[in-house]
Amino acid sequence: MEAQRAFGFLFICVSIAVGSASTISEIAYLNGAALYYHAAIWVGSFGLVFGAATPIFRKVAPAIRGRMKASTKWPMGTKALNGVCWAGPFVAIAALPEFYQYLILLGIGLGNLSTYSLIKRYSGNDNREQLIVGALSLASLPVALAMDTSIFAMNPDIAVMLSRILIAVSYAAGGAHALIEVKRRRQSS
């Protein structure tokens, strides 16, 4: 239960950082800010969110490490498969940069789904928050494609921002599920 609470909090923090960085970065783009400002915005957003959350992360870090350590006991082929699911789409960005917003959604979706499936298989844990993030990220692919090719075809920057917002929503949904589930279990015991 502590690991689920820790990951719920982590996912909420990721959601806040991605959502705020996406919005601020779009505002900077619309105002003609230089490219290096975008990097500063993203690093700053994650730094502020995770910096503000440091006291809580100190308390929940052992639970996060514990869940992550479980994957070190997986067979080598399983670790490789999980790594490809996470890293493959991100590596593909170098070859297909015009599809990066879709590849990011694909990487987050496949990575979370593979990790969920493998943890369930090898540890017996049902980390549904990870399933939710993965499933929503993959379900966001056609939505992002529709936004990019029709609704916002004349404003591709907005389509990119909205695909990032979809990532934030996916993490928010997974994090909220985890925290609500922990609260429900505590109330029933």
What are the residue ranges of the model-derived segments?
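Helical transmembrane-bundle signal
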Residues: 15-22, 46-51, 86-89, 108, ...
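Terminal transmembrane helical module of multi-pass membrane proteins
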Residues: 118-189
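Alpha-helical transmembrane segments of polytopic membrane proteins
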Residues: 10-11, 38-47, 78, 102-108, ...
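Membrane-helix interface and helix-disruption motif detector
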Residues: 27-42, 91-105, 147-163
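N-terminal juxtamembrane cytosolic/stromal segments of multi-pass membrane proteins
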Residues: 1-9
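Selected alpha-helical membrane-embedding segments in polytopic membrane proteins
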Residues: 9-94
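Membrane-proximal helix-loop-helix units in multi-pass membrane proteins
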Residues: 74-136
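Structural signature of transmembrane alpha-helix termini at the membrane-water interface
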Residues: 23-27, 52-56, 91-94, 110-121, ...
